[in-house]
Amino acid sequence: MPSFDIVSKVDMQEVDNAVNQTIKEIAQRYDFKGSKSEITQEKDTVKLLSEDDFRLKAIIDILQSKFIKRGISVKALQYGKVENASGGMVRQIITIQQGISKEKGKEINNVIKETKLKVQSQIQEDQLRVTGKNIDDLQEVIQLLKGKDLGVELQFVNFRQ
């Protein structure tokens, strides 16, 4: 039976490249001269530290533009609260979402079932597998999910016949 998997993955090498480009741009920009702004990346998080909210927002804008240029969806970013740090600084932690959560998996599952197409979908850890007898039905599901805004970036992989 034909099937495909729905996943939500982010290329961490591209994230690393985008963060490094952002660091370089901050070092060169005139409005950041003499400011104490820094970005650090650890596994699935990016920590932003700056002197005030204005500069923090500017760093986020730069980071988002670099993500977009590198082909990473900004839907994969989950922004934490802006916190006060020591020395009058402000901090924000951005988490990079990998995989599809159980709640999002159920939501996608319901969207697929509402179509009344002859396909089955199963939640498998952080991905969904969709199977059906007809390839056209599977392609219709892909088009439907591409058109919906589910809050996560979806990739369709492992298409088998």
Swiss-Prot record:
Pfam families: DUF520. One of its GO terms (molecular function) is nucleotide binding. GO terms for cellular component: cytosol. InterPro entries: DUF520, UPF0234-like_C, UPF0234_N, YajQ-like_sf. CDD domains: YajQ_like. It comes from the Bacteria. Gene3D superfamilies: 3.30.70.860, YajQ-like, domain 2. The keyword Nucleotide-binding applies. Keywords: Nucleotide-binding. The keyword Nucleotide-binding applies. Belongs to the YajQ family. Nucleotide-binding protein. NCBIfam families: PRK05412.1 (NF003819). This is Nucleotide-binding protein Gura_0717. It comes from Geotalea uraniireducens (strain Rf4).
